From Swiss-Prot:
UniProt protein name: Sarcosine/dimethylglycine N-methyltransferase
Keywords, ordered alphabetically: Methyltransferase, S-adenosyl-L-methionine, Transferase
Pathways per UniProt: Amine and polyamine biosynthesis; betaine biosynthesis via glycine pathway; betaine from glycine: step 2/3; Amine and polyamine biosynthesis; betaine biosynthesis via glycine pathway; betaine from glycine: step 3/3
Regulation of its function: p-chloromercuribenzoate acid inhibits 23% of the SDMT activities on sarcosine and dimethylglycine, and S-adenosylhomocysteine (AdoHcy) inhibits completely GSMT activities.
Organism annotation: Halorhodospira halochloris (Ectothiorhodospira halochloris)
Residue ranges the record marks as coiled coil: none
Record flagged with keyword Transcription: no
């Protein structure tokens, strides 16, 4: 039986990503491997190529990855990053994710690609990670923390399960530190949350938890570029979604993508790659 979560925001996120509409949309439009923001060389590059480039760039920052490494992916989606890391480095990965539907796709693709012996897919929320203290060499996350109603708790959990000297590499769509009050409300309404994280929030919270910031690669311009690219792909391939994704979902998605693009272009949002090391 699928777990239900008491926190409404967590349960809302779980139900959204478990829905047939969302599952089919991300599989058809986004590609079904990586469902996060991409690093684009040009505006019309395939979404899957740009999304994979983000994974490649993040992994290139790590000094821990190798056959003896143990990685936790917090909010793993369909597990594309975990499979990339397992294939390239031979490391073991715990792919923790809220959506049971996504996790079933993840397990199937792991088997098809011959890496199921390296990847454990875990049905769980990252507010309560079901692993012992200090067992991971690298904690990894892509564009997932924004869905949490308690990001400070998520960061405490990341710190708890990471060994001393371990790495924390993540991305998250964030509210800019100087964002005017109230202007991102349409985005918050879409993701059913009251707040978004900011760069200062992540820096201060992780500093208090004993982390050293190694670098932040600011790729803010890629956020509206990515959501604009998804919007155009949706317009181009909308006919393929008929019978798989409801008209209501498609209309909400178009509106949501437009809000992300507008917020990014106006400087209200920021995005990039954080790289921290635990002391």
């Amino acid at each position: 039986m699928a777990t239900r979560y008491d926190d409404q925001a967590i349960e809302t996120a779980r139900q959204y990503y478990n829905s047939e509409d969302a599952d089919n949309f991300y599989a058809i439009i986004w590609g079904g491997e990586d469902i996060h923001i991409g690093l684009y060389n040009d505006d019309e590059e395939p979404i899957a190529d740009a999304s994979r480039r983000t994974v490649e760039r993040m992994s290139s920052l790590s000094r821990q990855l190798g056959p003896d490494s143990y990685v936790l992916d917090m909010g793993a989606g369909y597990g594309g990053s975990a499979r990339y890391l397992a294939h390239k480095y031979g490391c073991k990965v715990a792919a923790l994710n809220l959506s049971e539907r996504e996790n079933e796709r993840d397990r199937q693709m792991n088997k098809e690609q011959g890496v199921d012996h390296l990847i454990e897919v875990v049905d769980a929320a990252f507010e309560d990670v079901p692993y012992d203290d200090g067992v991971f060499d690298l904690v990894w996350s892509q564009d997932s923390f924004l869905h949490s109603p308690d990001r400070e708790r998520v960061l405490r959990e990341a710190s708890r399960v990471l060994r001393s000297g371990g790495e924390f590499i993540f991305t998250d769509p964030m509210q800019a530190d100087d964002c005017p009050e109230g202007v991102i409300q349409p985005i918050l309404d879409r993701i059913h949350l009251e707040t978004m994280g900011t760069p200062n929030f992540y820096r201060q919270t992780l500093r208090d938890l004993g982390f050293e910031e190694i670098t932040f690669e600011d790729h803010t311009h890629q956020l509206p570029r990515h959501y604009g690219r998804v919007r155009r792909e949706l317009d181009r391939r909308e006919g393929e979604l008929q019978g798989h994704v409801s008209a209501e979902y498609i209309e909400r998605m178009k509106n949501g993508l437009d809000h992300w693009v507008n917020g990014g272009n106006k400087g209200y949002l920021t995005w990039g790659i954080f790289y921290f090391r635990k002391g």
